[in-house]
Amino acid sequence: MDKFQIQGNGPLKGEIRVSGAKNAALPILCAGLLTADTVTIDNVPNLQDTRTMLKLLRQMGMHAEMTGSTATLKGTDINSPEAPYELVKTMRASILVLGPLVARFGEARVSLPGGCGIGARPVDQHIKGLQAMGAEISIEHGFIHARASRLKGARVVTDMITVTGTENLLMAATLADGETVLENAAREPEVTDLANLLVKMGAKIDGIGTDRLIVQGVDKLHGATHSVVADRIEAGTFLCAAAASLGDLVLRDIPPLILDAVLIKLREAGANIETGDDWIRLSMSQRAQAVSFRTSEYPAFPTDMQAQFMALNAVAEGTARITETIFENRFMHVQELNRLGANITAEGNTAVVTGVPRLSGASVMATDLRASASLVIAGLVADGDTVIDRIYHLDRGYDRMEDKLSAVGAKIRRIA
């Protein structure tokens, strides 16, 4: 099982090109199920999760090829509208095939999902929405069975804001009979990116980027070409690493607007930040100031940046309170950061971080995707060597992280 060995050293300096967003690429790949035509997707990150999704689509009968960062999808021969447990258990986003399959083929059989172990993250909102659109759904032997002769437009009000739920219902609504209104819709840039692709494919969607999406169903969608939006979480992770290491880092191919809440907190921590249309530069001349925050839905502070900012706060001056409102059980990195010398206490959904001048290298274990990233940041600024075990979590969401960090001065390598 691969590990990272990191030798803490000086500041990160240089340039990094930001990859396409995993959380946009996965639903966008699923959108290929909605048409028999060819859909070409550029800027797809080379990740374990994207490879798993392509494998799942191929297993259903889709022609799905990946050349470099371009995926080519053709859904003429889909013959098995099923997502088996063997693939779904490793990736929660597999649930995103449910809406497209029911909408185009009238049936789907999808195993209940797995992925990172950070709380319940139930799929009941997906099911509730599809039932409102006329699908008959049952759950038997760990599988969601859905059937509908044709989905009907409906007004769907989810009980909570759910990104994958919004994406699933949005894709389903594109081929439904009549108008569907999705209230309390997620507004994340990745949802907007999916909606923009669907429009290119012939979908009729109003309210893109808002919490109220109005979809006029069409009889069929056609092929399109699309480029995946930049990964704001990858970008934020590298910015936190640069801030913690007192570095000077330029990120390319990232529109700063989608990272607004993170940039505000980095400035509050003392970072000097410059931006252009598609680049961000962060420089840090002194030890960061501790910053408190509360995670919430976009455009507020993202839960997927909570762990990275905890690592930054661990070496900052002062004390910060971090409140996690999106997922339960998302402080599993606290214990591992404390092994590196951090001073963090967690109770319920709030963690209190008192910064220390230095961390010290140790052997630690990654528990989920973003927790892994926080340990990398901590290792980069710790005295001595840090070894991070179970980095397969990291490979699910970061494209060649060690290569990108090495190019800007980090001493990090993958070991068996």
Curated annotation (Swiss-Prot):
This protein's UniProt keywords: Cell cycle, Cell division, Cell shape, Cell wall biogenesis/degradation, Cytoplasm, Peptidoglycan synthesis, Pyruvate, Transferase
Gene3D superfamilies, alphabetized: Enolpyruvate transferase domain (3.65.10.10)
Pathway: Cell wall biogenesis; peptidoglycan biosynthesis
Disulfide-bond pairs as recorded: none
Compartments in which it is found: Cytoplasm
Record EC number: 2.5.1.7
Positions annotated as active site in the UniProt record: 116
SUPFAM superfamilies: EPT/RTPC-like
UniProt entry tagged with the keyword Ribosomal protein: no
GO molecular function, one term: UDP-N-acetylglucosamine 1-carboxyvinyltransferase activity
Residue sites binding phosphoenolpyruvate per the record: 22-23
Function of the protein: Cell wall formation. Adds enolpyruvyl to UDP-N-acetylglucosamine.
The name this protein goes by in its record: UDP-N-acetylglucosamine 1-carboxyvinyltransferase
Native source organism of the sequence: Cupriavidus pinatubonensis (strain JMP 134 / LMG 1197) (Cupriavidus necator (strain JMP 134))
Name of the gene encoding the protein in the UniProt record: murA
